[in-house]
């Protein structure tokens, strides 16, 4: 198959000309080993999603972690409807897990709890039932706005002290904005 330059989303090395995505960010594995939560921000079309998909696959294949790249973008239309945003985000995360993780590392069906705590509850349940430490990369988190963005950030902060047994060992917010910009964007 002839390869080509891709400018429309994640690259596939079998189809597209690309640099090794994981070699571009060697410090990330160290952050994960240190149970860090971190932000990866860069302009559009610079390889963030490609790199994080490749890193998640490599970490999972190593046998040491259950690592996945998920997206928060489906929650973007709901600036103040936390319940709807959470439900759509969790549905997208379940689909991503089904397509990217082996059956033995799939999350449980996310239990329904009250709005404002669904994401934390799902991540907690997933970490507690996972046979390996859970690593989650949340792409497009900066697509969220208003009350929804604040709710997501508060839930992640609330779960942080419970890692790695009851919350992801390591978590990355991936997008175009630095974390300092999130509160401003939330209003």
Residue ranges and their predicted role:
Residues 61-77:
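Conserved catalytic segments around the Walker B and adjacent sensor/switch elements
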């Amino acid at each position: 198959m002839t390869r080509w330059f891709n400018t429309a989303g994640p690259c596939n090395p079998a189809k597209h000309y690309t640099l090794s995505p994981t070699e571009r960010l060697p410090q990330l594995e160290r952050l994960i080993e240190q149970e860090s939560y971190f932000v990866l921000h860069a302009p559009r079309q610079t390889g963030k999603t490609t790199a994080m998909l490749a890193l998640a696959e490599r970490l999972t294949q190593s046998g040491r972690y259950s690592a996945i790249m998920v997206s928060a973008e489906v929650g973007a239309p709901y600036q103040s409807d936390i319940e709807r945003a959470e439900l759509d985000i969790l549905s997208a995360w379940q689909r991503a897990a089904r397509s990217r993780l082996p059956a033995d590392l799939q999350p449980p069906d996310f239990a329904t709890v009250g709005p404002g705590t669904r994401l934390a509850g799902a991540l907690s349940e997933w970490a507690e039932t996972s046979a390996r430490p859970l690593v989650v990369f949340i792409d497009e988190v900066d697509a969220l706005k208003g009350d929804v963005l604040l709710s997501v950030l508060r839930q992640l902060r609330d779960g942080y002290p419970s890692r790695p047994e009851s919350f992801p060992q390591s978590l990355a917010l991936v997008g175009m904005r630095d974390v300092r910009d999130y509160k401003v964007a939330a209003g």
